[in-house]
Amino acid sequence: MSEEVADNAAVVPKSRPLTKAEKVQAAGMKYAEKKTTVFFTDSTIASNLDDFATFNRDQLKLGKVLGKGRFGTVYEVMDITLAPKQASDDTWLIEERQFIHDHVRREEGSGFHSGDARYAIKILSPEVMKDSGLFIQGIYDMAVEARVLSDIEHTNIVKCRAIAPVSPLQGAEFYLMMDRLYDTLHKRMSKWGKKQKRRGSLLGRTFLDKGGKKEEETHLKKMTCAYDLASAMGYLHNRRIIYRDLKPENIGFDIRDDIKLFDFGLATEMKESRLADPSDEYCDVYKLTGMTGSPRYMSNGTFSKLSFVSIFRFLSITTTT
């Protein structure tokens, strides 16, 4: 899919002049387009957006809000209306659209989470559309996330299933459809903490956790989460992709309770043009922007606004026991 910004005429009818807000959005789209072009110049991250099934926004029936970030809101997808097939449609994409349509909800009476939506979409929040600064950053983040997700695949990274048939820079019209997640590590850690307190009491040790089996199960789950998360981060680092916003709120669990890393708007790439000293063939230090991510979870260097990082620094993961 082309990432070029559509002409203003394609966004606003010619019968009336652009409003001030529309002019700001149009300028924001052009700025975000230039920023995105620079970001992906000489990139090894391929744009595979044309390989995804597409649905117009009006084909999707949305349900409740599942989550909300600084720029985007995530809704469950309750139903999809299929549009008439076009002669130019690729056979594989027709089949993919049909599959997503047929499996948009889990079967009633199937047991665990029966009738639930299988998919969720991420779109720009309404309030972001009204703020020029947030709008520019929001569509830029969506463009980065769309391209990154289109070119990565890992068991513990959320999978993109479909996209809108417009550029990510079109703002309100663009969305990413992904597998629905049911929990975050942030919420799970809170549950683990409460269970730990209950098991720590005399009553808990006597009746709730005979032989320490439940505590052992929880510890095993924590270690599995740490291992799977390290696997996902290792995959990204091998692709020279730096996630930059690792925190419990951006780590979820799917229907099978497998851990999934999501929200790639702040991801960046270690490419040769960012080398601190391109003339040094052994240089492993890259130029990056400081203060990117969530302050509470930033590394000391990032929080201190250091603009250099080595590709060989190790990821440290701490689990509570």
Language model: regions and residue ranges:
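Conserved short submotifs of the Hanks-type protein kinase catalytic core
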Residues: 170-184
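Activation segment signature within eukaryotic-like protein kinase domains
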Residues: 225-226
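Juxta-kinase regulatory segment immediately upstream of eukaryotic protein kinase catalytic domains
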Residues: 11-54, 63
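Catalytic-loop of the protein kinase fold
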Residues: 237-254
